[in-house]
């Protein structure tokens, strides 16, 4: 995790975090190192890691999952006849009551429909102090799985300036992986 602030002065902080996960969960977060501004580490990065610990289990029943119950999807672009390009969807929240739903764009891989990128804006400010939150989330395919690659979030801090939070995911170690059965693999329709 890395955060940069500019406004009434400039500051930055970084935190390296190891995340371990084994089914059925939960994820285990271990802070390996911290550098930079103590204020940003204690008031931004540590609460972020704490929130990720609390929200580590995401299911299709979760109020922020990318499912039709939470979003209206509109196809914006599709691959050409040769399979070149991506499926591009516009996502609009079905309700304004869920805190972390977003307005944005989703890019899907043309061959396996994996989510490659999500870019959007939160329709509501998460707090009085934070507004105009935008994000750009990228994934990477490792083996048969789409896993996080980067997440860059920008926000305006009321009266004080701007902050950029960047999370880079790397050094994945996948062991004992069994693909999840799909309806198509079971002889059904997807």
Can you annotate each of these PLM segments?
Residues 146-150:
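Short, positively biased Gly/Pro-containing turn/loop motifs at secondary-structure boundaries
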Residues 1-103, 111-114, 123-133, 140-145, ...:
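Structured extracytoplasmic
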């Amino acid at each position: 995790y890395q955060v940069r602030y500019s406004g009434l002065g400039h500051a930055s902080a970084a935190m390296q975090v190891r995340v371990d996960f084994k089914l059925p969960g939960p994820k285990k977060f271990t802070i390996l190192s911290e550098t930079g501004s103590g204020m940003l580490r204690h008031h931004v990065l540590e609460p972020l890691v704490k929130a990720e610990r609390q929200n580590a289990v995401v299911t299709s029943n979760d109020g922020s999952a990318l499912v039709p119950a939470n979003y209206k999807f509109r196809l914006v672009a599709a691959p050409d006849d040769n399979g070149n390009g991506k499926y591009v969807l516009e996502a609009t929240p079905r309700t304004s009551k869920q805190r972390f739903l977003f307005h944005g764009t989703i890019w899907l891989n043309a061959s396996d429909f994996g989510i490659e990128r999500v870019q959007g804006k939160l329709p509501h400010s998460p707090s009085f102090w934070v507004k105009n939150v935008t994000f750009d989330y990228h994934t990477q395919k490792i083996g048969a799985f789409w896993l996080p690659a980067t997440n860059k979030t920008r926000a305006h801090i009321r009266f004080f300036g701007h902050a950029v939070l960047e999370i880079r995911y790397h050094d994945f170690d996948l062991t004992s992986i069994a693909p999840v059965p799909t309806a198509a693999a079971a002889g059904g329709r997807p």
